[in-house]
Amino acid sequence: MVQRLTEFDTIAAISTPLGEGGISIVRVSGEDAVAIVNRLFKGKDLEKVPSHTINYGHIVDPATGQVIDEVMASVMLAPKTFTKEDIVEINCHGGIVVTNDILQLLLANGARMADPGEFTKRAFVNGRIDLTQAESVMDIIRAKTDKARQVAVKQLSGGLLTEIRALRQEILDVLANVEVNIDYPEYDEEEVTAQKLLACAEAVSGKIDRLLETAQEGQILRNGLKTAIVGRPNVGKSSLLNYLTQSDKAIVTDVAGTTRDTLEEFVSVKGVPLELIDTAGIHHTEDQVEKIGVERSKKAIAQADLILLLLDGSQELTEEDRQLLELTAGKKRIIVLNKTDLGQKLTAAEIAKESGSEVISTSIMMKENLDELEALIKKLFFKGIENSNDQVLVTNQRQAGLLAKAKQQLADVASGLEAGMPVDLVQIDFTGAWESLGEITGDSAPDELINDLFSQFCLGK
């Protein structure tokens, strides 16, 4: 478990993306944050200003007296800050040179360059947030839809933390009772204690199940669905990509083989984030460039969470169509019967019967039934959970894996009791479940896990 400490060196980093813009923010956190910035700041004495104030002045190189930039310095004193340390944020003009010059001056005057995610790590170590809230910080930054942002904000406010700590408390209450009975066996009725253990294990396991039921939806909102748009050449793949992205990223022509590679784009479809991959048409070709595109398309199909398979409804099924139906069998897919405006030689009913998949008839060029296609994508992966703003979702594999581990440990408790094992032996798995749940929030997480998690954060956060 990571020790709760407040004695760190002072760190600095640029918190805004590098490049030209209105402003850049350089963040400084630590015991000497105010003193270090004050050495460079010409204006009010920052060591005497009230907390949570914004102060106008200039950053000046103390070695040369050169003015670097006109800035606003926000002073926030511990403990009412993100890291629970003293923080100064320097708002300077946006630009690579000026921002880096200010950072280098801070480093030359006593600050250390922050590691990726170190500000958030300090917030965790100092007890400001738990691990689920730390993860939600990056989820907010990376959110690709409004719903993903809402879920991340809910988690940042402690939604999952509250649920997990309540489960741990249920286990702890029973563990305390077991410990007393082990210490004072003359007062123990082992059958009664075993019944309490079993009842608690079943109750907590049921609540874990309800959380795990949200894991698919939560991880889709967080990571998006890899969605491959496939079909033989010139059936409308690029037209569908352009409709969903509202762009002309893919070249649309009547020439087969126009898309020679895979094109990727992130879009929100009814609140579901899709990583759309427009694949090259899969067909026999002697063109070496097209061959590479076809192989990449097959790889994209293998890795996809969802397949949008386009067929030309104005023509009979070709051998290439049948190969694609076979290649995508077993994957979650929607068959899009395109070009209904040209007359139909294929019907949705017969394709659905032959393929066992959902089928939508449409004319992408005429924008017919495309809203129904979007609704079907949402229906395939969501069960109404995403419509509730109050629902707590499990949003990543780490959380889901630890919940599953705790559930298995509780199942071992139940099977052990049913097999007649002594309570003090069964208690080991019961304590294990309590610790597994604690790893989710960081209450009992090993240092290696903590360091690995925060290393994935961006610099300056």
From Swiss-Prot:
Q: Gene3D superfamilies, alphabetically?
A: P-loop containing nucleotide triphosphate hydrolases, Probable tRNA modification gtpase trme, domain 1, tRNA modification GTPase MnmE domain 2
Q: Name one Pfam family in it.
A: TrmE_N
> Which CDD domains does its entry note?
trmE, TrmE_N
- Entry binding sites for GTP: 234-239, 253-259, 278-281
Return the PROSITE patterns for the record.
G_TRME
Alphabetically sorted, this entry's keywords are: Cytoplasm, GTP-binding, Hydrolase, Magnesium, Metal-binding, Nucleotide-binding, Potassium, tRNA processing
Q: How is the co-factor bound, per the entry?
A: Binds 1 potassium ion per subunit.
Q: Which residues bind Mg(2+)?
A: S238, T259
EC number(s) on file: 3.6.-.-
Required cofactor names: K(+)
Q: What residues does the TrmE-type G domain cover?
A: 224-382
Matching InterPro entries: G_TrmE (IPR031168), GTP-bd (IPR006073), GTP-bd_TrmE_N (IPR018948), GTPase_MnmE (IPR004520), MnmE_dom2 (IPR027368), MnmE_helical (IPR025867), P-loop_NTPase (IPR027417), Small_GTP-bd (IPR005225)
| GO BP, sorted A to Z | tRNA methylation; tRNA wobble uridine modification
Which of this chain's residues are annotated to bind K(+)?
N234, T253, V255, T258
A cellular component annotation (GO) from this entry: cytosol
- Membrane-traversing stretches: none
| Leading EC class | hydrolase
In terms of PANTHER family, this protein maps to: TRNA MODIFICATION GTPASE GTPBP3, TRNA MODIFICATION GTPASE GTPBP3, MITOCHONDRIAL
Family to which the UniProt record says this protein belongs: Belongs to the TRAFAC class TrmE-Era-EngA-EngB-Septin-like GTPase superfamily. TrmE GTPase family.
Name it.
tRNA modification GTPase MnmE
Native species of this protein? Lactobacillus delbrueckii subsp. bulgaricus (strain ATCC 11842 / DSM 20081 / BCRC 10696 / JCM 1002 / NBRC 13953 / NCIMB 11778 / NCTC 12712 / WDCM 00102 / Lb 14)
